[in-house]
Amino acid sequence: MALESVWAPQAAVIGDGLSERVGEQASPQTQVLQTASLKDGPAKRAVWVRRDHSEPEPTTSPEVKKPKLELTKAVVVDLGTGYCKCGFAGLPKPTHRISTTVGKPYMETAKTGDNRKETFVGHELINPEVRLKLINPLRHGIIVDWDTVQDIWEYLFHQEMKIAPEEHAVLVSDPPLSPHTNREKYAEMLFETFKTPAMHIAYQSRLSMYSYGRTSGLVVEVGHGVSYVVPIYEGYPLPSITGRLDYAGSDLTTYLMCLMNTAGKHFTEGQLGIVEDIKKKCCFVALDPIEEKKVPATEHMIQYTLPDGQAIYLCQERFLCSEMFFKPSLIKSMQLGLHTQTVSCLNKCDIALKRDLMGNILLCGGSTMLSGFPNRLQKELSSMCPNDTPQVSVLPERDTAVWTGGSILASLQGFQPLWVHRSEYEEHGPFFLYRRCF
């Protein structure tokens, strides 16, 4: 079995961004891949180059006869605090998406000895036969329960994708500033438990940047459990000036519930799933919250039908909830606002790098999908940097930007030498990862 990539990677599409210069899309005939040598660094091996290409495709000499090999597609997995996305490399978007929250039976159920399941994942959480305690193996993007993560991967491979993991290479995303032991634990799980033939671990922010087709940029990621502002130069993240904010989409959901309860609704923590749906369908980010408050409440009123058929109405809480991103004190956080943290990271860069990053601010993460989010961030950054020209760029499906970047990367012929094979892991140990995953 060979682990080479034989499928055509899908180019990322730059959509409705505020920066017009990234709005054009090249035709398939003008999209070619730059596969530089290993010494050029990961970015130059992964970037899509949009230019005319007149050189003929390299052909294999007819004199060289190779044995016919079984070829399989690599699997890309992006495990986040809120959701896990997975699918085969080369596809434009993930084919499977499940909640990272799992269910564990309460102790009295687990002790009955009736051989019932110990962990419920994904669709198994719908109408379970036993009472479940919901838990999440990640805290602010960092894995704290590896046994539960293994249960999630077991479900992904065998129930969702229905594949044999020992037949597919796996590319895994890793959050910024994560412990180095994360990578070693992933290698141990994939190689020793699932017997995968090869694996690679890549930084989430770098993968997000690849989905935009860039080699440098300031990645602003607002996910479910944590937010990051990551400067990247020629494919290399700069951890010393990376900003981390411990508030994100889950905090927005909780704050929305508080606002609705203050307005007379009665939601509990057990109904956060409903509040999450309300957030996605009804909420937005105001360009100017002060002016928005002056608008009559009736103009903001919108109806939402609960699962039991009861109708509720939302007014100003629709946009007030998202103000926590720009004023974290609303949720009793002492950290900087997202826009302030972004400018802080830019100011820590030297002048030349700052100029490059200022024009390449790349949004990603599910929470940035709120209507009005890119425009508001653009306005705040322009206000704080009047002498510069910050440009916020967005993709239409930036909630899956990490996975899409991984799909592109794992498909590239120039990337194939960077797989870590199980035989290499068995011979050299987990530290061999750092030779290929950097």
Curated annotation (Swiss-Prot):
Compartments where located: Cytoplasm, Cytoskeleton; Golgi apparatus; Cytoplasm; Nucleus
Instruction: Supply one GO BP term.
Output: fertilization
What the entry lists under Gene3D superfamilies is as follows: 3.30.420.40, Actin, Chain A, domain 4
Q: Give the residue ranges for region: Required for interaction with TES.
A: 36-56
Origin: domain of life: Eukaryota
Q: According to the UniProt entry, where is the signal peptide?
A: none
Q: What cellular-component terms does GO give this entry?
A: acrosomal vesicle; cytoplasm; cytoskeleton; Golgi apparatus; male germ cell nucleus; motile cilium; nucleus; protein-containing complex
InterPro entries, per the entry: Actin (IPR004000), ACTL7A_N (IPR031769), ATPase_NBD (IPR043129)
Chief location of this protein?
Answer: cytoplasm
Q: Which UniProt keywords apply?
A: Cytoplasm, Cytoskeleton, Differentiation, Fertilization, Golgi apparatus, Nucleus, Spermatogenesis
**Protein's UniProt keywords contain Cytoplasm:** yes
Pfam families assigned to the protein according to its UniProt record, in alphabetical order: Actin, ACTL7A_N
Asked if the keyword Disulfide bond belongs to this entry, the reply reads no
**According to its UniProt entry, what is the function of this protein?**
Essential for normal spermatogenesis and male fertility. Required for normal sperm head morphology, acroplaxome formation, acrosome attachment, and acrosome granule stability. May anchor and stabilize acrosomal adherence to the acroplaxome at least in part by facilitating the presence of F-actin in the subacrosomal space. May play an important role in formation and fusion of Golgi-derived vesicles during acrosome biogenesis.
Q: What is stated as this protein's family in its record?
A: Belongs to the actin family.
What interactions and quaternary structure are annotated?
Interacts (via N-terminus) with TES (via LIM domain 2). Heterodimer with TES; the heterodimer interacts with ENAH to form a heterotrimer. Interacts with ACTL9. Interacts with CYLC1; the interaction may be relevant for proper acrosome attachment to the nuclear envelope.
Please report the name of this protein according to its UniProt entry.
Actin-like protein 7A
Q: Which organism is it from?
A: Bos taurus
